[in-house]
Amino acid sequence: MLNKYPLWKYLLILAVLAVGFIYSAPNLYPDDPAVQISGASTALQVTQADVDRAAKALTDAGIAVKADSLSKKGGLIRLVKQDDQLPAKEVVRRTLGDDYVVALNLAQTTPEWLRKLGGSPMKLGLDLSGGVHFLLEVDMDKAVDARLKVYESEVKSLLRKERVRYRSLPIQDRAIQLGFTDSESLDKARSLIAKDFRDFEVVPEERNGLQVLRVALTQAKLAEIREYSIKQNLTTVRNRVNELGVSEPLVQRQGANRIVVELPGVQDTAEAKRILGKTANLEFRLAAEPDALKSATETFEFREPRRPPVPLERGVIITGDQVTDASASFDENGRPQVNIRLDGHGGELMNRATRNNVGRSMAVVFIEQKPVTRYTKQMVDGVEKEVAVPAFKEEKQIISLATIQSPLGNQFRITGLDGPGESSELALLLRAGGLAAPMYFAEERTIGPSLGADNIAKGIDASLWGMLFVSLFIIVIYRFFGVIATVALAFNMVMLVALMSILGATLTLPGIAGIVLTMGMAVDANVLIFSRIREELANGMSVQRAIHEGFNRAFTAILDANLTSLLVGGILYAMGTGPVKGFAVTMSLGIITSMFTAIMVTRAMVNLIFGGRDFKKLWI
């Protein structure tokens, strides 16, 4: 029979729509503005007393508190107004001190039964939630030049060790230049370098009677250095962003040499730039002898709080400036280890310090500039007030203490670690002492929370007006079939929101534009179908046959048009940046949902209403 679906197909469509309604429902529950409290270190746990103290301080400061709670992640205080978030953060930070991290957050109000089903609202982009956007550019040329200088030092150290006489020449065209007065020295140097430095292309040349050895990095090694630099800077930036106490920050790579940092809720760009640009370092020191004088030792805490403090010698062997690489791996027995590489000068210093101290322990001290807030009295508008002044304090902690098994050089390894997790963390900390390459701020943008809320309101208005005008147009043109298309359009919006929520896609202002565009594209499919039905009726077909042929013959055109649009969406996503990607994601998901609602859902409703009935005329 024409225009009839089997029962299973109706049930399948109902099931898909039900899932759509369930997973789009969390977006009906707006998040509460909140401040989140956690310990600055894993050893410090937030207690209910801390939360109560913070809540009381907020109430005393005239900031309305909606509710508070305590979980394994820390304390959460919900506020009534979003504009109170920044003042609340300052009050709580001042009340609890620098031992606690106070972060701006948005607390979900989704009912428990929806959360158990995995339902959560869409994430909002920076243009809708407010915050700071930075685009950092990594100077890759400086990264290559710095690594080349390290290799130059190592090559010269090798030649001096093997007593090969050479003349030092300046680096030229990304290549180390070495001059020799005789071919015998050149050949010996070439053989030594080729043996110990496999990542170099060694080419002999002759210039003005001087024999020159040109030592250049291979293209593969250059690519490896650039990749390492961007990854290392990405890791360091992530570590520094964590100190800002921001809920759900975004730190991701963009292109070959750029890093995007988005900090929702942050309005103080100066503080964010200070944190991102701050420095950390490392020190390698020998553990103090039991009979050492107190004046010659210094005691340090471990980064791991369960271990007791250890006295170390005041003399520093090398610093993190000499560490060129650190990576986690496994030894020949499958045990975790950390491989460390030093520059030429660092290797000499390390060898000098360890060759007579085999059997003693050596510690790696991590030095970090921690942000603290101090309060000073200042005159503000003729009134003396306490004003927060951001500052940094130096914190030194031991991250590794290992026994020296043999004299060390510019390459050595740390073993005796508890597991691969500890080796990975140690390697990360050894690399986090600084940036692998200089960075500068290529772009900076601040979006206030009120502007974000205004963008949301305007986006909702645009979507509603768009849906209203599209619905009126299609109802006027196609009458009762226009009503069916409008219902399908509403289902399409529900399905699109549900799909974005399930996938965890971020909704941005261009994404809202994609939603409005999706409405027109969804109705476009209905227009093709209904126009085809009109044509078949005009050609003298019966009502049932016209409906059947209208849907079937329009399908190919709809599929071709939507596949072409999906291809464009894919290209936009692959080639575009943040805002363009947001638009591409929403548009592409909207195309998928519109094909389902315009073809399957609309057909199901038409079949239920008109299928199997003897209609002489259609309201189309």
UniProtKB/Swiss-Prot annotation:
Membrane topology recorded in Swiss-Prot or TrEMBL: Multi-pass membrane protein
NCBIfam families: 2A0604s01, secD
UniProt keyword terms in alphabetical order: Cell inner membrane, Cell membrane, Membrane, Protein transport, Translocation, Transmembrane, Transmembrane helix, Transport
Alphabetical list of InterPro entries matching this protein: SecD (IPR005791), SecD-TM (IPR027398), SecD/SecF_arch_bac (IPR022813), SecD/SecF_CS (IPR022646), SecD_1st (IPR048631), SecD_SecF_C (IPR048634), SecD_SecF_C_bact (IPR055344), SecDF_P1_head (IPR054384)
Name of protein: Protein translocase subunit SecD
A single BP term in Gene Ontology: protein transport by the Sec complex
Bridged cysteine pairs (disulfide): none
Entry similarity comment: Belongs to the SecD/SecF family. SecD subfamily.
Organism: Pseudomonas aeruginosa (strain ATCC 15692 / DSM 22644 / CIP 104116 / JCM 14847 / LMG 12228 / 1C / PRS 101 / PAO1)
Location relative to the cell: Cell inner membrane
